[in-house]
Amino acid sequence: MAEEEKMRRQLVLAKPFSLEDEKDSELTASSVIRKILSLIKTVRPGSDLTNFQLPPQLILPRSRLQCYGEMIYSFGGQDLLGECSRRNIPIERLKSVVTWNISTLRPVVVGMSPYNPILGETHHVSNGYINVLTEQVMHHPPVSALHATHEQENIDVTWCQYFTPKFRGAYVDVEVNGKRIMKLLHHKETYEMDQPRLIMKFLPAPGAHWAGKVKIKCPETDLEAELHLISDSFIERFRGNNNRSIKGKIFESSSGNQLYNIFGHWDRTVMAKNLKTGGLEVIYNANENITGLKPPTVKNLQEVMESESTIVWSEVSEGILKKDWERAREAKILVEEKQREALKQREASGESWVPKHFSVVKDGKDWHCSPLQPTVPRAPLVITEK
C-alpha cells in the first residue's frame, strides 16, 4: 500500500488546454513574449530550434506525447471519431473524417512549449471505446508514434510525426512532418491526411495559429477534401484578433467534380454547403467539442508503465504547477541526465535501442511507424464521463 501511494503521488495529470482557457493565456502573453525575445536575441533567423532549451517558466506541465494523445482522447462532446464509421454512405463518411480532423486542431498557449519526450517515453489513455497509445520512437530527429483504436466502430488511427521549428525573426514556423492514417475497417476504407504547420508570432502582437493546406484522401471511394487554414493578416495580428478561418472543398478525385464547400473558423463553427442542393449544415462546433476538457484519472495504478509521461515528468510538473522554478529546473536536468546515462550504457554494451510498441522504417526523408499490436488495449488512465 505504501508503494502504491508513492506511485500515485508520482503521477501528475495536468488538465488539457481548453478553448475557454485562452483568455487566461492571453493575459500573460505579453510578459511571456518579453522573456522569449530576451532568450532568442542571439538566434539567427532560419535556425533550427528543435534542441533549444527553455526555462521552466516557459514550459507547460505536460509532454508533447500528451498533447498528441489529447487530440484524440480529449473531447467535451460527441465521439467524432466513432461517427466516421457510423455513416452509411461514402460522402457522409468523408465529411465526418473532415469534421474529426478539424476537431484535432487545438488552441496553443502562446510562447509556451511542452516537454520534449525522452526516448521510449509512452502515454496511454482511454476514453469510452477509444484507446490511445503514443511512444517516442526516436530522439534525433524527435519522432513520435501514435496508435489509436475504436473498439466499437473498428477504427484504426496511426501517426508517425516529427516537427521542425525554425526561427524567422518575428515568429517561429513549426513544420509538422508525417502523415495521419485512419482506417475504417468495417468499410475497408483508408483515409490519408496531411498535417498543418504551427505559426507562433511574437510581433506586432503575440499569437499562435495553425496554417497551411491539409489534404484528406480516400482511394477506395474516389473522394478527397482540401482544407486551407488561413493565418491572420498583419492588420488582424496588430489589432490582437484571432481570425482562425478555414476554407476548403470536397470533390471527386478522378473527375475533380466539386461536391461541397467548407468554410468557417476552427475555434468556432465550420459549415458545409452542398453545391448540388445549396443546403447548408454545421459540421463542427468547437464550443461543444473542445471546452470543459478534463485530465485523465487513474483507473488501475498497477498497470501504469514506468515510461508513462505523467511519471517521467512528474517532479518537473510538480515544480511548475507550484511555481517552484528551481525544483522544476533541477528535476528536468535529472530526467535529461538519466537519458544520457542510458545512452552511454547502450553504447558501451553495443546495444541498439528499439521501440517497445512500434516498428520504425525510414523512407527517404520520411519515417513510417507501424504498431506491433493490431489494437490498443484499455489504458490504466481514463477519461471519466461528466
Swiss-Prot record:
The keyword Cell division does not apply. Transmembrane segments: none annotated. GO terms for biological process: lipid transport. Expressed in roots, stems and flowers. GO terms for molecular function: lipid binding. Keywords: Lipid transport, Lipid-binding, Transport. InterPro entries: OSBP_sf, Oxysterol-bd. May be involved in the transport of sterols. Belongs to the OSBP family. This is Oxysterol-binding protein-related protein 4A. It comes from Arabidopsis thaliana. The gene is ORP4A.
